[in-house]
């Protein structure tokens, strides 16, 4: 099985909260797609609650689009990581990490301004696969923690696992 880019970096050295450019690729038409690792919690140390991350999934995707989309950037998707330590964001364009961090901060402030669980978009059985698994309170606690901690930048060069270690860890 091919080794995915996200598994070539040392998760034990990742800072959180932090932004990292996980991958860049070119489309056949020449557009650049950038995938960002938006790490909310330190891997293997903390985990986002099920209800909190699910509620953030509904809120964060819209708020990030409000703050980041523009003439040179269009968000394709923001999805929670299976490990529940953050989100992956794929977009067309190449915004710098600090621009993404600023949009993330503004989005967390927006989460804190949501007044009622009934204001969570697509919170119904027709548009959500587990519409009863939400907590605005838990989402706000996550947002508060992000704002209190601030957002750093993780660089792939600083986190790259040595080739020898990748071979040693490989499951054939």
Curated annotation (Swiss-Prot):
Q: Which reaction does it catalyse?
A: S-(5-deoxy-D-ribos-5-yl)-L-homocysteine = (S)-4,5-dihydroxypentane-2,3-dione + L-homocysteine
Q: How does the cofactor attach, per the note?
A: Binds 1 Fe cation per subunit.
What biological-process GO terms show up in the record?
A: quorum sensing
Record Gene3D superfamilies: S-ribosylhomocysteinase (LuxS) (3.30.1360.80)
| Binding of Fe cation, residues | 54, 58, 128
- What organism, scientifically named, is this protein from? Aliivibrio salmonicida (strain LFI1238)
Tell me how this protein assembles. Homodimer.
Q: What is the protein's given name?
A: S-ribosylhomocysteine lyase
Q: Which UniProt keywords apply?
A: Autoinducer synthesis, Iron, Lyase, Metal-binding, Quorum sensing
Keyword Lyase part of the UniProt annotation = yes
Q: Which cofactors? A: Fe cation
Stated EC number for the protein is: 4.4.1.21
Instruction: Please name the PANTHER family in this protein's record.
Output: S-RIBOSYLHOMOCYSTEINE LYASE
Q: What does this protein do?
A: Involved in the synthesis of autoinducer 2 (AI-2) which is secreted by bacteria and is used to communicate both the cell density and the metabolic potential of the environment. The regulation of gene expression in response to changes in cell density is called quorum sensing. Catalyzes the transformation of S-ribosylhomocysteine (RHC) to homocysteine (HC) and 4,5-dihydroxy-2,3-pentadione (DPD).
């Amino acid at each position: 099985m091919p080794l995915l880019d996200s598994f070539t970096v040392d998760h034990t050295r990742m800072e959180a909260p932090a932004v990292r450019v996980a991958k860049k690729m070119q489309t056949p038409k020449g557009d650049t797609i950038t995938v960002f690792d938006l790490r909310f919690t330190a891997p293997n140390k903390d985990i986002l609650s099920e209800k909190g991350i699910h509620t953030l999934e509904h809120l964060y995707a819209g708020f990030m689009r409000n703050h980041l989309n523009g003439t040179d950037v269009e968000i394709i998707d923001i999805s929670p990581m299976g490990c529940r330590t953050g989100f992956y964001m794929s977009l067309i364009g190449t915004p710098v990490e600090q621009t993404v961090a600023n949009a993330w901060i503004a989005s967390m402030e927006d989460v804190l301004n949501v007044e009622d669980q009934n204001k969570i978009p697509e919170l119904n059985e027709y548009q959500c696969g587990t519409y009863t698994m939400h907590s605005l309170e838990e989402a706000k606690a996550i947002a508060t923690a992000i704002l209190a901690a601030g957002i750093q930048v993780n660089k792939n060069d600083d986190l790259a696992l040595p080739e020898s270690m990748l071979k040693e860890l490989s499951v054939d």
